[in-house]
Amino acid sequence: MIAFSTCWNSQKHSDGLAMVEEILELGFDTVEISHGLKVSLLPGIIRAFEEKIIKVAGVHNFCPSPVEVLIDAPDCYEFTSHRERERKRAIDLTLTTIKTAEKFNAKYIVLHLGSIPMKRISPKLEKLALNDKGESKAYEKQKNKLLKKRQKIAPLYIERAKSALDKVLIEASENSINLGIESRSAYEDLPNEEEMISLMKHYEDTPVVGYWHDFGHIQRKHNLGLLDHDEWLSKMNPHIKGCHLHDVKWPHRDHQVPFSGDINFTELFKKIPNDIPIVWELSHRRTKKEILESLSKWNSIFNTNVEKNT
C-alpha cells in the first residue's frame, strides 16, 4: 500500500476536505493522518472518508494535535519525561490517537517513544560531516562522547517507555491496531538500534507491537557512521510494520522527495516486505512539481501505480 502523509499540507489548510483534495490531485488515494493536525480539520477528513473519497492507512501520534500546543510538535509530551503528569498526558494523547485510528478503520499508529535528556551532540557530528570532517579526530571524540554518555543514562528512560507502551497496547490490541515504534534521526532519541532490537524481543508475543522504518532518519545515522542502512534493514525485516519514505541530502537534510538525495531505494527495497504501508512523508517545502516527477520515477522503477492502491 502506498500512502501520503498529511504533514505535507495540513498546516496551510483550514478545511480537511480541501487538504485531502490537494493530495488526491497528486494521484494518491490513501493518506496517513499525521501529527500536527488541527482538530478543526477532522470533520472534513471524516466527510472524505465516509464518502469514500479517501482511504486512511494509519495515524501518526499525536493526532489530533493537543489543543494547548499551537505548533506542530510531536514530542511536546514524552513517555520518558521526568514529570509524571507529562508522561500521563503523553499516554492519554496516544489513547486518543488510537481512537482516531479506529474512526477511520486505520491499521496502525506511528509512535515516538521519547528521548534521553542530555546535551545534543548529533548536530555537532552533522556539522563536522557537512564540512568533510567525518573522519577527523574531533569527529571521533564527539561521537564516542555521545555513545558513552547515552549508554550510561539510558536504562531509566527505556523502562519509562516500556511502562507507557504497556498501558496503550491494551487498547491497540483490542482493536487490532499496530503500534509502529519509529526509528529516530538523532542518537539522543529513543530507542537507538540496540534498544529497538531489545524492544522487539520484549514484545515478541505482542503482535501489534513492531518496528516503523523511517528511511530518512536511518540514512542520517548511516551518514554519521552510526549504522549501515542496508544491514539494519536486513536485521529488522521480520519486525517492520511500515515505512516513512523520504530522501536525504548529505548529511542531514531529510524529508526530500525520493531520488533527490543519497538513498539507494532500489537496493534497500529488496529488504522491505511487500504487504506493508509505504508512506510518503515530505516537507511542506516540497513542490507539487517535485513530487509528481519523483512519483513518476518511482512508478517506473517499482511498477507501482498509486491510483490503483488496494
Give the location of each predicted region:
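Glycine-rich, proline-tolerant flexible connector loops at the mouths of alpha/beta enzymes
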Residues: 33-55, 119-120
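Active-site acidic/histidine proton-transfer and metal-coordination neighborhood
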Residues: 79-210
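Residue-level detector of anion-binding/catalytic polar loops
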Residues: 29-30, 55, 107, 178, ...
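Short glycine-enriched loops at secondary-structure junctions
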Residues: 7-11, 60-67, 114-116
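Short catalytic-loop micro-motif centered on adjacent basic/acidic residues
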Residues: 29-35, 180-182, 280
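N-terminal substrate-binding region of glycoside hydrolase catalytic domains
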Residues: 20-41, 71
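Flexible loop residues that form catalytic
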Residues: 36, 62-64, 114, 248, ...
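Histidine-acidic metal/acid-base catalytic patches
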Residues: 1-24, 39, 50-52, 96-110, ...
